[in-house]
Amino acid sequence: MSRVVIKCGGRVVRGSAAAILTLADAGHEVCVVHGAGPQISEEMERFGIPVEFVGGRRVTTAAGLAVVRSSFAAVNRALCAELGPRAVGLLGDEIGLHALQLPELGLVGEPLPSRPKAVLEALDSGLIPVVAPLGVGPLNVNADEAAAALAVGLEAERLLFVTDVAGVFRDGVVLSSIEAGEADRLLDDGTFEGGIVPKLRAAIAAARNGVRAEIGETAVVA
């Protein structure tokens, strides 16, 4: 069976367990990467920490990173509890998810293709690694980018983005597929904006490295 990386956004984490377990029960090796965007923003606002994004990445100070880490840990525990005894919770910075720091954004990193031993051992044991997207440093890492980096590093066959939208929309219609070059062009001219942007960029990177990437119902092909 194939190796699959599933990225679950913070808004849909609690509703993702059934889809994850269905793939695992079918014999696929499943690695999960989760976000926690809404939870992090809520906590940052509670502590009076400014919430700012640049190109889909969260500007992160030392105080912000503490909130990011605690929020990721809480979401990770909740998702593992929902998945049951096969789930193994992992924090990316503790297992060797490497990233290049982007100093202009603070304690933020651009993840590099990684093949963490802890993830491989979990998969080999028939378990489901559930990874919080922190990079070695520690650095805050965009969850979409982290999922793509792991998919490439783990040589996964598929990268699935589970979101609260049906897929990539253009002119009000969900696309069944989009070619990476066309997606690049539309991103550059501003056709796409908001949360779909980092997902598309991550899917493009994965597709160009041999991974079949899907955002909801939309396949992104190299």
Predicted segments — roles?
Residues 1-222:
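C-terminal catalytic "cap/lid" subdomain
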